[in-house]
Amino acid sequence: MPAAYDNYDYPSYWDNRDYEHGSEVEAIKTLLENISKVKKVIEIGGGFGRLIPSYSFRVKKIILTDPSAKLLSNARKKYKDSKKIKFLQSTLENVPKVVKQRDFDLAIMVRVLHHIEDIDSAFETIHKLLDKNGYFILEFANKRHVKATIRHFLGGDITYPMEIHPVDIRSKKSVRANTLPFINFHPDQIMQCLQTAGFDIIQTLSVSNIRSSFLKRMFPLKFLLDIEKLLQKPLSGIKFGPSVFVLARKRVN
């Protein structure tokens, strides 16, 4: 059965999104500074390998997983000369059935959680894959980002920032078409679920903080990314941006 992204040109989605991509690369590199040594990484939902260059320089072995045969084929072509990367077509829940558990120093999952409804099960699966003291870099779509909060305030919904339940932002047409869910999460829910699954939170970053078509037209990419780099840590406390990156560590019991 084809995966959802087999019927979608995901690489083209990233055309004209150099700022968003660069912001995510910067976030991963910043979080990696907290980890002294990484040998083996598994990236969940890694697609066509967009983010591999952001961490491959730090690791010896990489397993890139994705449900989409089409995206993995793109990744294989892109990294055909790399001996450190292996490719695995699998959904997250099936990964532990085909790879050794407690075998990875680091798991990375970016732009995946918004398609997952059972996040508790997802975090438990990641926990099983990680070795003792293993790390988890997670990205999630932030329900409470500043633009959404202002929009709800103007609409009279002053309790919006405190409503912890997730929101599926698909259109009615997409819901009727049974497309993948697209869920924005409250940061407090994510932190609570990670801790329940056996993780300690090491650091969070607010990402894509100045995402704006207007700013992209007005300023060069390097300038925007320099500003983004300066903002990711200071704005993490209020979860300002539409995307939040988390570094968590498997708790030692």
Predicted regions and their residues:
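A conserved beta-strand element that flanks and buttresses the S-adenosyl-L-methionine
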Residues: 108
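Conserved class I S-adenosyl-L-methionine
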Residues: 1-36, 38-47, 50-54, 71-74, 137-165, 225-226
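Acceptor-substrate binding/catalytic loop of class I
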Residues: 140, 174-189
